[in-house]
Amino acid sequence: MWQIVFFTLSCDLVRAAAYNNFRRSMDSIGRRQYQVQHGSCSYTFLLPETDNCRSPGSYVPNAVQRDAPLDYDDSVQRLQVLENIMENNTQWLIKLENYIQDNMKKEMVEMQQNAVQNQTAVMIEIGTNLLNQTAEQTRKLTDVEAQVLNQTTRLELQLLEHSLSTNKLEKQILDQTSEINKLQDKNSFLEKKVLDMEDKHIVQLRSIKEEKDQLQVLVSKQNSIIEELEKQLVTATVNNSVLQKQQHDLMETVHSLLTMISPSKSPKDTFVAKEEQIIYRDCAEVFKSGLTTNGIYTLTFPNSTEEIKAYCDMETSGGGWTVIQRREDGSVDFQRTWKEYKVGFGNPSGEHWLGNEFVFQVTNQQPYVLKIHLKDWEGNEAYSLYEHFYLSGEELNYRIHLKGLTGTAGKISSISQPGNDFSTKDADNDKCICKCSQMLTGGWWFDACGPSNLNGMYYPQRQNTNKFNGIKWYYWKGSGYSLKGTTMMIRPADF
């Protein structure tokens, strides 16, 4: 930049010197400007006006005089003077330029060196100041950076803690959401199940109401029948008394006649026929004696003269079966007392219960088998055969004992094992806090309350399903199916 300034000043000085020299040499000549360009410099000259030139008014106005040539010698002389002057000035300017270039180089170098030294000192001072300021700014920036780093580290730690806490909370939220979804699913399932149970309960309540109405009708009919039977019983009792009196009179008459006819015979000979009467303990003995027809036979309690009427099945599986229970038409009410189940009730040729006491005494004399024959309302039949069966005495509530199940009415025994005590409506010996005999009706070997009850309420066809208190054998038809008919019969194991 200093070189450019210096060169500009030099050009101005040269131009000024040339101008002054030319003006001094041209003082006597008229002034006219003439500019010359040389290199980077431009020169302006003031040229004199010629006195020998004529004025426009001195010319002849006609065309011949205007086209006539001027004075040639005078013009040539003036041009030569001007050329000489121009040549001298040019030579002088060239010398001046060379002088300026030779002499000004040293000064320009010195000026450049001085400018560089001054600039260097200034720049060094400026650089020193800048370095000091930079160092101060760097120190401040270092402090700020350390503070920022500490603050950033603290924020990163807080952010990490918040992130861990957030992850933990998110995990807890996910777990709680999953648990809520599970609970919602379970709640939906339970609600659906409750609705289904409500529907089932409504159906069952309707069915129970219908059963209740039917039972009320049946009870009314049975009450009428009972009243009629009571009347018939009174009549039969009266007739029986008359018949017994007549029989007694006839026996006395016969005895008198026998005494009159054979006065020599002793009383022992009179009752020979009675002493020769055959005693049967069960239907197997009846069968072995040659009586092989189904029917009612008189059996005698073991070690006793007490007799009982029993139905003997002489055809099923070889015969010799003593029937201890039969259900076929619902004509007999099996909701009886303990005493009635002990001695038996019903008609041996139809629905009846033979009696727990007789079965206990018979089955404790020798090993017996128990066969249970079942019928459903669709015409199907099945059976369960227990290879060993006996009852305990009344002191043990006629507890049942069974072993060795075979048959087609289920692979599992529907009579719970080990043996259960017998229960009736007035003797609750089951294993339930409820009273199974009252709930399910009938006397049976209830557990709590167990999968079977062949002495339950008798239901006719199309009313025999969904009955919890009917005649049931769970492992053949389920708990809600009431059977059409059942037969329980016993026979010695060695028959």
From Swiss-Prot:
Entry GO terms, CC: collagen-containing extracellular matrix; extracellular space
Annotated binding of Ca(2+), by residue: D428, D430, C432, C434
Alphabetically ordered keywords of this record: Angiogenesis, Calcium, Coiled coil, Developmental protein, Differentiation, Disulfide bond, Glycoprotein, Metal-binding, Secreted, Signal
Primary site of residence: secreted
Domains: entry comment: The Fibrinogen C-terminal domain mediates interaction with the TEK/TIE2 receptor.
Segments forming domain Fibrinogen C-terminal: 274-494
Designated name of the protein: Angiopoietin-2
InterPro entries found in the cross-reference section: FIB_ANG-like (IPR037579), Fibrinogen-like_C (IPR036056), Fibrinogen_a/b/g_C_1 (IPR014716), Fibrinogen_a/b/g_C_dom (IPR002181), Fibrinogen_CS (IPR020837)
Cystine crosslinks: C283-C312, C432-C434, C436-C449
Species the sequence originates in: Canis lupus familiaris
SMART domains assigned: FBG
Parts forming coiled coils: 165-247
